[in-house]
Amino acid sequence: PARAAAGRASASRIPRERPVAAFVMDVYPVTNGQYLEFVRVHPEWRRSRVKALFADASYLRHWRGDLEPGDRAPADSPVVYVSWFAARAYLRSHGRRLPTVDEWEYAAAASETERDASRDARFLGRIRDWYGRPTPEPIPPVGSGLRNVYGVGDLHGLIWEWTLDFNSALVTGESRGDASLERNLYCGSGAVGAADFENYAAFMRYAFRSSLEARYSVGNLGFRGVLAGPETAR
């Protein structure tokens, strides 16, 4: 795991910050190989047995079978098509939890050389370029991307990731420039970057999170864990 020192998450252009306590984050997202070991021990989370309340019909749809990921899900690639409930169960079994939006955005704002690269046009441009490309299949292995100044890898460039309080972002505006949308992105989510429309990558993350439900399983959505404090969401 990589340690992020305590700091403050700042919403650009709005004179308000939120404190973020120190936390320890997994260096990489959870892989198919790691998740396979989890479902071996916890059969209730196998594809054929999981309850519809906790995962939709797309859960692990790219795996060949309950205990056989297959060619579309290499062991060292991040696991996707997993619900929020499944991610939480996996991490609880390993003594960890999902990062909050604030924690994830705090870590994700760091580049290879800066703790806060939220004003770095080159850094933001690379993220936007990735968001504009289709997700490859199979997804490349973890470690394919860059590691930031904290030593955390693949926060951008491989997959989107679940957060503990993903549904705290509420997008209700009708256009990118809608004042109510900007207000909801900042006040509803209370984390980094979404209030600054120059940081379009952050806006896209908040919009994506607002579209999710906890049982959804999406082909480019995985997760990683953190060690820090009690779980408070849900």
Please give the residue ranges for each predicted region.
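Chymotrypsin/trypsin-fold serine protease catalytic domain
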Residues: 113-139, 183
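Short, solvent-exposed loop/turn elements at domain surfaces
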Residues: 1-9, 32-37, 46-47, 194-200, ...
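Acidic glycine-/aspartate-rich tracts in secreted/extracellular proteins
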Residues: 165-167, 230-231
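Active-site microenvironments of metalloenzymes and redox enzymes
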Residues: 19-119, 123, 227-234
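Cytochrome P450 core scaffold surrounding the K-helix E-X-X-R motif
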Residues: 2-8, 166-174
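Short, well-ordered junction/capping motifs at the entry into regular secondary structure
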Residues: 73, 128-156, 210
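Disulfide-stabilized, aromatic/cysteine-rich ligand-recognition loop
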Residues: 21, 77-78, 82-85, 96, ...
